[in-house]
Each structure stands twice: as structure tokens, then as C-alpha cells.
């Protein structure tokens, strides 16, 4: 009986090690493909202070396709509703808060395996100033379940911004 238990444990260990090795053998681009839930965006100021532009419990998704396309939506969980219940008749204050607390971007992407970066080639965004830009992010962590990428120099010298994602199962 003990021999069967030991054999089963060894088989399980070998299979999990094999799965880990297979993941390591995949290119970063192959590993990144799929659908990711947005966990949090964390901005770290030069003095080390952290802030969360979409709050600490945001909603969102990031999708990478095998043919090099991406779509990203980040929304704070506490974005206020428009009082009129009509998206075309909100107040300037309502629109300003929505703009501050949400971001949608799509386009194409490339992965630089050697430098461990992903570059987003933005076709369109809810922040139109980004259209046509290529924005590169460091791939800080990429496992079967987690993806973290960081913009090391946020505009205006505000520090760095890291986005944390969990793979959708």
C-alpha cells in the first residue's frame, strides 16, 4: 500500500515538474496569449509612496490574441452612475469622473523575448492622446496564472506604474 502511495506521489511530482518545464520552454509571447482579469494598478512615486488610480478593487480585462492583437479595459469599481441614466446626457462632472476612473485601449502588440518587454501599439483608446503610440512595458512576472507589467517612467516623472493580472480559467 505504501509503495502505491509513494509511486502516485512521484508520478504527480514528475507531471507537475513536466508542466512547469513546458511552460518555461514556451516563448513569452506564447505564454502571454489569453484572457487576463485585471487585479490592480499600482503607481509607485519616486519617494516610494503607492497609489491606486482605479482603486484597490477595480474591474477589467486584458486580452492577447495569438495573431498579435490586444484589448484592455480598466475601470474603478466605484465609478458613479450617470444620474440621467442616459450616457449621452451626463453632467461635465460625471464625465470627468468617468474619464479619471476608467481606461480602454486596443491595438497590436509585440513581445521582446530578450528584454522581457511587451510593446502596445495603440490603435485607439478612451484617452485619445495615446492613439498611434507604441508603449513598452517591462514583463516583471509571467506565470501560468499571473502577469505583471510595469511602465518604468510614468509621464510627468510620477514614478512607475505596475498592472497586475490573473489568468481567466
Q: Regions from the language model: what does each represent?
A:
Residues 1-10:
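Bacterial N-terminal signal peptides that target proteins for export
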Residues 8, 18-169:
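Lipid interaction determinants
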